[in-house]
Structures are given as C-alpha cells and as structure tokens.
Amino acid sequence: MKKEHLYSGKGKSIFATDNPNHIIMHFRDDLTAFNGEKKETCLGKGIYLNNINAFLMDKLAQQGVKTSFIEKINQRESLTHKLDMIQLEFVVRNIAAGTIVKRVGLTKGSPLSPPIQELFLKNDKLGDPFINIHYVNSLKITSAEVVAQAEKISLQVNDIIKDVFTKINIDLVDFKLEFGLLDGELYLGDEISPDTCRLWDQKSKRPFDKDLFRFDLGDVKEGYDRICELLGLKVTIDTHDLQADHQDN
C-alpha cells in the first residue's frame, strides 16, 4: 500500500509502502535537461517511461540480472526493492554522442568498439562530474570491487538491451545506470528508459530519446510513444492518469 512521500528527483517521486524494504516509484511528467536548467511538462511522459522501464527490467531479470524492479502496479507506478544507492552513475557508450564528442574530440555517430565505460559522481549541485576509480577510492564512495562488479553488469545490461533495440531497428547509442546494495548484494536500480538512454533510428539516425527535448529536435511524446509502439507495448493515456500525476505530487 502506498504511504508517505519520501522524496522527489527530477522525474520521479518515491513513496514508502507497508513493507519497509519496498518503495513505489511514481513517474512524473516533468522534463528536465542540463542539470535542471531547462524544464518543461510533457503530459503522459511518465506513463510511457513506467511502461518502457518495466518491459526492459523484465528482460534483464529473465537473463539473470538482479534489479530493484518487482512489478508495475499501475500506469504510472512500479514497486521496487529499497536499495542503499551508490552515489555513482555508470555510463556505457556504443556510439559517440553527447559530452564525449566535445571532451575527446570524436565525431558524433562514430561507433565505439569495444564500448566505452565512464563514471560520474551523482551530485546535482556539482553537475554530476566525470570522475575515475581514483576519486572513488580516495573519497571512499564505495569499494573498487563494487565498481568492478557494477561495470561488469553494465556490459551485460548493454548486450541484452542493445539486442532488444536492434531487433526493432533502433541503435542503443549510450545509457546510464545506477546501482545499490541490498543485503550486501549489488542490484541495478533506478530506471532504464528514453530519459536515461540515447536511442536512434538505425537508418535516419533520428533520436527517440530526451535529446528531442534537450536540443528542440522534435516532439518528446511522439518519440516515446514510437518506442512503446516498436516494443509492442500498448500504452493508453487518459484524463484520470494525467490528474493522478498532479494529485500525487
């Protein structure tokens, strides 16, 4: 049962449940970019992301990846395990795009083989800075063993999700993951969605992700709806769902 509101991030609100080991992730319709500097509301966006995330988390679980996801409980919300989150973001890049293009001087769209893995400190006030294992060790964020395990799982996740999208003629350009501990074991947490991945049409290279909003490249709702359609997800957005998003936050 959904209880008190615990906290809100950029696009989700977290609620307690009757079980102290479980939480509810409520996907809101807020769109943010550039560390919250650009903001907008896209009605129904949270519903698309909740459905896509549930689908991908199920795929990962089927392949033996331990995730926080338990079940989708309605159009906007999912029940998950409560993790002790690690304050790092693990990024996997299959194709050059975003910050790596400027930072390393790569050409946008260049394939990266093997994939490049990057670490970022999860800190909104600092803009989630790019770091390496030496920072992790010195600042005692977590152990080097946990980082190595998370990076290994990240590549496994990459193989599974890339295959899912390749089958629908979409390139998985890059994505970020977050991890947490549960009873001493490492679990994949947070979400996997067009808000946390770059997804390009294989032929046209048209994006179907949050870059549509970041760089004013098109309609976000259309892009997310297209991903749902390609994945075979039947997503219905009605007035009650939209009202619920505002009532719960």
Per-segment meaning from a language model:
Residues I141-V173:
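A long amphipathic alpha-helix within ATP-dependent nucleotide-binding catalytic cores
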